Amino acid sequence: MGNNVVVLGTQWGDEGKGKIVDLLTEDAKYVVRYQGGHNAGHTLVIDGQKTVLHLIPSGILRNNVKCIIGNGVVLSPEALIKEMSGLEDRGVPVRERLFISEACPLILPYHVALDQAREAARGKKAIGTTGRGIGPAYEDKVARRGLRVGDLFDMASFAEKLQEVMAFHNFQLEHFYKVEPVSYEAVLEQAKGYAELLTSMVIDVTNELDAARKRGDKIMFEGAQGTLLDIDHGTYPYVTSSNTTAGGVAAGSGFGPRHLGYILGIAKAYCTRVGAGPFPTELFDEVGDHLGTKGHEFGATTGRKRRCGWFDAVAMRRAIQINSVTGFCLTKLDVLDGLKEIKICTGYQMPDGSIAEVSPMAADAFENVTPIFETMPGWSETTFGAKTLAELPQTALDYIKRIEELTGVPVDIISTGPDRNETIIKVHPFSA
């Protein structure tokens, strides 16, 4: 299938991508983030030690891996430096292995102020953003007024551009949202403080990755959030501000799309969602509470409680269409241990009585569907920490097989716990 693997979420994010990227990068030379920002929360557990990464690619804990932040990522210098410091305090040589595209848009304090002011103004209609400035930074990029990492090479020009964009945003903050403006002088001084560090990490990402491809190096592209949060294909407007799908890889890194190989879709054995937006299989009973408690379903970035529900094969089919998913990694199978019965959503009944086999695009249409469930027997045995299929109960194997039948895509990897070695690999993406 080739040396270039994409790992992305096929639900509403929080599927367990970080662990899988860390696991598979034993064989990789590069790990590339291509979209999102520090609104991502990728949790790794290695020999019992927990690491949460928000911006730096999950391959950073591997000595053999170069990590790249591509142009599709909106970069908060403050968040990056904090994350780097935490890793360096543990002896991880981040500066030797982390590289940045000069085309990365910068997230600056006025983006955060705007994000939070807007969410407050929306009241009950709030989207549920992380409040970290992601959306406003992407807006500035599209409006062609955003500042980028490359602008830090010329601080005189940077200061001039900053003054112009801050005048625009501070007017909104003061006169529309009725909150305090952000200090231009403070932001400029901040930028001067991290300019040298950021510019020292800049490389020509497209050239680097193309050279790596020609050498035959293994490259992994690490997605953030999930397909159903994609700005174009997700449950709009309850979405993130970037393209979280496989199509975002080329645009967000400059890597030629023809060279992409295996697309690994990450999916929980059930579904979760953080914040507002439609969620057809959501559970409001003790089973939902059980999934949330046993699965430790609290956001790595925000700490917010995640909503929990049954596995949704209908939404999954849409994710497969969009991403050309080669194979799945099914995570958190062990969370289903002990349930007497398990349900899978196999179709949506639409308001007109018709049955949909793939999910609708818009949030309004999503809100009006009635999920159709198939009930399967659960299992009392533990699957936690299983490393071979032989260790799984037959009913768990039947559940996995049914997901494969309903989606038409094989489950190639099964995660049975948070540690990197608590995994069953049927097919390795780099060997497929």
Curated annotation (Swiss-Prot):
MF annotations from Gene Ontology: adenylosuccinate synthase activity; GTP binding; magnesium ion binding
Keyword Cytoplasm tagged: yes
Cofactor dependence: Mg(2+)
A Pfam family it matches: Adenylsucc_synt
Binding residues annotated for IMP, in chain numbering: D14, E15, G16, K17, N39, A40, G41, H42, T130, R144, Q225, T240, R304
Coarse class of the protein's main subcellular location: cytoplasm
Residues annotated as the enzyme's active site: D14 (proton acceptor), H42 (proton donor)
Xref: CDD domains: AdSS (cd03108)
Gene Ontology BP annotations: 'de novo' AMP biosynthetic process; IMP metabolic process
Pathway assigned to this chain's UniProt record: Purine metabolism; AMP biosynthesis via de novo pathway; AMP from IMP: step 1/2
Keyword field contains Nucleotide-binding: yes
GO CC term, one of those recorded: cytoplasm
Keyword line: Cytoplasm, GTP-binding, Ligase, Magnesium, Metal-binding, Nucleotide-binding, Purine biosynthesis
Co-factor: note: Binds 1 Mg(2+) ion per subunit.
Binding site for Mg(2+): D14, G41
Places the protein is found: Cytoplasm
Classification via PROSITE patterns: ADENYLOSUCCIN_SYN_1, ADENYLOSUCCIN_SYN_2
EC number: 6.3.4.4
InterPro entries: Adenylosuccin_syn_GTP-bd (IPR018220), Adenylosuccin_syn_Lys_AS (IPR033128), Adenylosuccinate_synth_dom1 (IPR042109), Adenylosuccinate_synth_dom2 (IPR042110), Adenylosuccinate_synth_dom3 (IPR042111), Adenylosuccinate_synthetase (IPR001114), P-loop_NTPase (IPR027417)
HAMAP family: Adenylosucc_synth (MF_00011)
Its job: Plays an important role in the de novo pathway of purine nucleotide biosynthesis. Catalyzes the first committed step in the biosynthesis of AMP from IMP.
Name recorded for this polypeptide: Adenylosuccinate synthetase
Originating species: Vibrio cholerae serotype O1 (strain ATCC 39315 / El Tor Inaba N16961)
Gene: purA
